[in-house]
Amino acid sequence: MYALPPDVFEAFEPRVTGITCPECAGVLEVQREGHGNLRFICRVGHTQAVDELLAGKEDKIENDLWAGVRALEELVALLGDLETYASRHGRVQTGGPHDRRIAQASDHVRRLRAILDEKRPVDLAVAGE
């Protein structure tokens, strides 16, 4: 798999890339513009220069990681509630059947939050910025 087609800097017409639009997840085409600049366009019409595409990808990654944190926290809460329900109705076993899953999901939440607390999941800052 490649992100940019090998002939992108020689081609004049748009080329399909191996990356998706950060706004709609549609396939991006890349087109060379004057002075060797690249412009990315999806089928819906979203158009981005390289710096806009990188910023959009970074924001998408961060949003997706936060969605993962929320989903895992909901899983921990649900499993905890199921454990409580089971124990109130005499169905709990020693160690609870969901304890391992709760511990794993809680650990994943901790690790994702550590990444997100570093400010950005991916640092795409260019030297001199």
Predicted regions span which residues?
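Short, charged, amphipathic alpha-helical segments
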Residues: 92-103, 127
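Short metal-binding segments enriched for Cys and/or His
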Residues: 46-64
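Amphipathic alpha-helical coiled-coil segments
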Residues: 104-122
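Short metal-coordination and nucleic-acid-contact micro-motifs, chiefly zinc-binding Cys/His arrays
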Residues: 14-18, 38
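Cysteine-rich micro-motifs
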Residues: 36-48
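Short Cys/His-rich "knuckle" micro-motifs
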Residues: 30-34, 51-53
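Short cysteine-rich clusters marking metal-coordination/redox-active sites
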Residues: 21-25, 39-42
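Non-transmembrane amphipathic alpha-helical segments
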Residues: 65-68, 72-86, 105, 112
